[in-house]
Amino acid sequence: VIRNLGSDDNTTQFVAGALQEGKKLGFKISTFLSNGDDAKFQDFVNQAISQKYDGIILSQGRDPYSTALVKKAVDAGIKVAVFDTAVSGEIPGVTVSQQDDASLTELSFGQLVKDFNGKANIVKLWVAGFPPMERRQAAYQTLLKQNPGIKELESIGAVSSDVQGDTANKVGAILAKYPKGKIDAIWGTWDAFSQGAYKALKENGRTEIKLYSIDISNQDLQLMREAGSPWKVSVAVDPKLIGA
């Protein structure tokens, strides 16, 4: 199992699902996380091919390299399944799966629009290049056009070995730029981003800003349950089930 993200709670659940299902089937499973480092992700895949694994599960592979990597693995006689990975066209024998990111966006960002009656100044937490992020961005742009009263002030994001910490720093800088009353809400396209935003809101005393997100974890639920929590909504599918 090779995933182009770090060891956040969502990834932990995804991997746990794969390990649990693999154990039931009698498989021996190795897991590799590349923390959003495309070069490292490709190295992991090439190593798996050279080591002649029987099967490979890829998650969060990006353009322009993923299709060629998948074809290389298939040509080597390896069974391949991909999740939220940028594979172009149909490759015989390859299982391709993804979330319904348009619905996730409509439910989470759509709730923000409803809560603010179609008028709000917002910050978006997002990064380009990952297939689910691109699909969420497309759905978001459609909703923005339908709701001209929603104004995007900033769009920030970082995929690294410390997504939460890096995002908290970026959001903290934005909070310093916009005084109270200038930002109504933050919309996160990934809960790891939202965890960082939550940290920044609490540390800077800016919990008047409401937080909406996609994806869920046990940590998220704890933060949402805290007294006076600004985290209002998170919409998700079960990452453990996806991994399985």
Please tell me what each predicted stretch does.
Residues 1-244:
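A residue-level marker of the well-folded mature domains of exported/periplasmic proteins
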